[in-house]
Amino acid sequence: MESREAGIERLYPKITGRMSALYYYLIQLRKQLERVIALYVRNSPHQLVADYGCGNKPYEPLFTPFVEQYIGLDLAYNTKADVVVDPAGIIDMPAESVGFVLSTQVLEHVEDPKAYLKEAHRILEKEGKLILSTHGYWMFHPDPTDFWRWTSTGLKKIVTEAGFEVVYFEGILGRSAMGLQLFQDGLLFKLPKPLRFLLSLILQPLIIFFDKIITAKSRNEDACTFVLVAKKV
């Protein structure tokens, strides 16, 4: 799929589309990022966003209406990166040069999360903010590696120890919904292609239902993905 189209489908998935198996999850992730933008980015004096591990920059359209510049940081193989991260994890940017660091589903793939967060802290301006999402429960998905999963307290701990104050923390898909998501994903690739869509069509509404009946407190403790905002201190 053309990368721009893939990014659009990730932002606005359809239950009948290629990403039907992730339909509800992707919608909730986008809504969380939109909420974070409304709370912390929309009226901020900080006007540069660095997407750290940018991939094909799927969330760029959410941020560009509210900031002056959005740049992608990634390893040299990614032709969409504006700034190269070297193999040692060092970003070719000066200290205190960006207002926001965006990190979406990257931390679990990084061999040294502490070094990754240290570099994010280095390039952030004083009181700049890290906007980060990463997995609590999720299936193994190397891209090209996959090292980590986080508990809610473990994620807060490693971010705080990197020199940040967590000011926002929300979970996406609580225990019951996540269990159904994993059940769906476990069966998905064992089925013939024509039946995969049917499985998603059956299970996605159930995932939505069970996620709606869980409390926010429970979801923020146990979730498939956590979204946080952390201020540099």
Segments predicted by a language model, with ranges:
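Conserved N-terminal segment of class I S-adenosyl-L-methionine
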Residues: 1-96, 100, 117, 221-226, ...
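Amphipathic, alpha-helical segments enriched in basic
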Residues: 4, 8-12, 16, 81, ...
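Short N-terminal micro-motifs specific to bacterial/archaeal maturation
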Residues: 20, 24, 81, 107, ...
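Flexible loop residues that form catalytic
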Residues: 57, 75, 106, 172-174
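A short beta-strand submotif of the Rossmann-like class I SAM-dependent methyltransferase core
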Residues: 100-106
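S-adenosyl-L-methionine-dependent methyltransferase catalytic module, highlighting the catalytic core
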Residues: 111-119, 125, 129-233
